[in-house]
Amino acid sequence: MRLHPVHPSLGSLRRFDSLGPIAAMVDRRSHRSVHEFSLRLFDAGLASAELMACYLGLELGLYRVLREVGPTTAAQVARHADLNPRMTREWLEQQTVAGIVTVDGEGDKPQDRRFALPDEHAEALLDEDSEHWIAPLVVMPIGGIAAVLPQLVDAYRTGEGLPYAAYGEAMRGGQAGLNGGVYKHHLPGWISRYMPDIDARLRVPGAAIADIACGSGLSTLALARMFPDAQVHGVDLDDASIADARDNLATAGSDLAGRVRFTAGNASDEPLTASYLLVCLFDALHDMAAPVEVLRACRRMLAPGGVVLLMEPSVGERFTATPPDSERFHYAVSVLHCLPVGMSETPSAATGTVMRPETVRGYAREAGFDTWVIDVGHPFHRLYRLTPSPESPVPRVVSTLPDRK
């Protein structure tokens, strides 16, 4: 057997020389597959590192300075942001090679280069009112999930999950921001288009809406703006979320103050039973340890002719190894957050983010609802309209509602 000199990375091919061309071809394919997978992980690692650098830009106010000051030098950016000049220049150069920031005078001396943030990038990073605002997706994994990774390791070993509060303020604010654009830009149209009967009834003075697991209240405030004659009540067991919601209400305008209120606690403690025309759970049911009991509590709160509206992740009817990227995202979020949160209470349904339509139908059926699936054409969200089944009695016992995410 004659061995030819080869590149070290192909050294494993040598042992197949005596086995013929087919074996060598198979090994080459295996090597190529490993190489391609390694490159894929490198790309993921690079994206993670660049996301961390974006987190620095948001937390340190660097993007804000770039937008306000315009094309300028690293020294000027550092001065306006009150940061170390050398570290600021390194960040600006990194942002340039990442394609986030532009540079004028690439070949000039470092101190003479002028950096700028393109308007479209500024909108995605800084404009909270834009439906393209993506900054929360930077904050959530870096500021929220990364901090609890050691606890997640333990949670996977014990199966005890991880409470929502453990993820902290960054995760709480990131979640609110990520869905805030949906509530503002899409939810009004969805309700009027797909639920015109409920939309009309909610415009009659005296109508009442309950927003269960309301989080920081952005969905509650959006509902109040949608229906200016309705009373809207947001409820959440997480005290920090309700504090955020009340802060948001305080800055939302005096026209909402008399119609919106927030309660920290169990929705079943609400004294006005059977009074709500619409009970909402937005992006929350899949996180709850006892989803059927939650839906039973919501059913008890409905006025005659009232409905429950769910917004949940838009995922496929069944598992597939090659789903769209949106479902890949939902699985990653489930692994890192939603499933551990849902399993932090026992007993738990352990649903996870990827709650498929048949699972929703099953939970709703057990709670005494008929289900209408509403495909709104959004890559990340789907609506479900639940109406009480005529043959199912209203439950007399209402279980405690778990926290929102």
Locate each region found by the language model.
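Short acidic, hydrophobic short linear motifs in intrinsically disordered regions
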Residues: 71-79
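C-terminal alpha-helical "lid/dimerization" subdomain adjacent to the S-adenosyl-L-methionine
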Residues: 311-366
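Conserved Class I S-adenosyl-L-methionine-dependent methyltransferase catalytic core
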Residues: 27-32, 38-60, 64-65, 80, ...
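Short helix-to-turn junction characteristic of helix-turn-helix DNA-binding domains
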Residues: 66-70, 224
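Conserved adenosyl
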Residues: 135, 142, 146-286, 291-293
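A short glycine-rich, Lys/Arg-flanked "PGG" loop and its adjoining helix->strand segment in the class I
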Residues: 292-304
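Long, low-complexity, charged/polar intrinsically disordered regions in eukaryotic proteins
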Residues: 2-43
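Core SAM-dependent methyltransferase catalytic element
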Residues: 367-404
